[in-house]
């Protein structure tokens, strides 16, 4: 089972446009290649798929091509936090603003900010980091969304809180409305 592969590739297709690549790699092609790679390796465990489209070669900083792709699939067992929960630290690293970088797109550069926060959290003995916006409001964690239930209400940062509008986030919001009778705030 590949979790919302089509939606992930549609977002990658959109992200290429925002990044102004000369060539836009078709999402269906990436889906076919990803399925082919998973089948060829006969994975039977939880895996992490990373599909990337990037400017290749030795172009200048403003280069928009040539465009290349890479798809990696590696086994990644579910983290203990899924069963046991985790400890989290509010990071001193502030989430990069959507005004500075297009955080709504899937872009490798967007991960570096969260990477620094997670390294700090681990060094301080925590499992995870929670990042705040420049205004001191909760944004998200490195490679994760933030949700909590307070007084029977599902609370999550808005899309204007410097977050990736993630497919996982949308899925949780849909499930909470449809099956849990929780309307998010």
What function would you assign to each model-found segment?
Residues 46-53:
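ATP-grasp fold ATP-binding core
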Residues 1-36, 40, 54, 60-185:
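Helix-start/capping segments and mature chain N-termini
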């Amino acid at each position: 089972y590949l979790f919302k592969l089509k939606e992930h590739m549609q977002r990658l297709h959109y992200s290429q446009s925002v990044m102004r690549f000369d060539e836009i790699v078709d999402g269906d092609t990436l889906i076919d290649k990803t399925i082919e790679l998973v089948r060829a390796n006969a994975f039977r465990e939880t895996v992490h798929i990373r599909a990337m489209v990037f400017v290749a070669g030795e172009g200048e900083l403003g280069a928009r091509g040539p465009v290349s792709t890479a798809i990696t699939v590696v086994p990644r067992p579910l983290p203990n936090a899924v069963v046991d929960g985790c400890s989290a630290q509010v990071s001193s690293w502030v989430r990069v603003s959507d005004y500075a970088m297009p955080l709504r797109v899937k872009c490798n550069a967007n991960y570096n900010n969260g990477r620094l926060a997670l390294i700090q959290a681990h060094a301080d003995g925590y499992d995870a980091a929670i990042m705040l916006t420049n205004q001191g409001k909760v944004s998200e964690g490195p490679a994760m969304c933030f949700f909590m239930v307070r007084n029977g209400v599902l609370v999550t940062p808005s899309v204007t809180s410097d977050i990736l509008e993630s497919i996982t986030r949308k899925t949780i919001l849909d499930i909470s409305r449809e099956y849990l009778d929780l309307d998010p705030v």
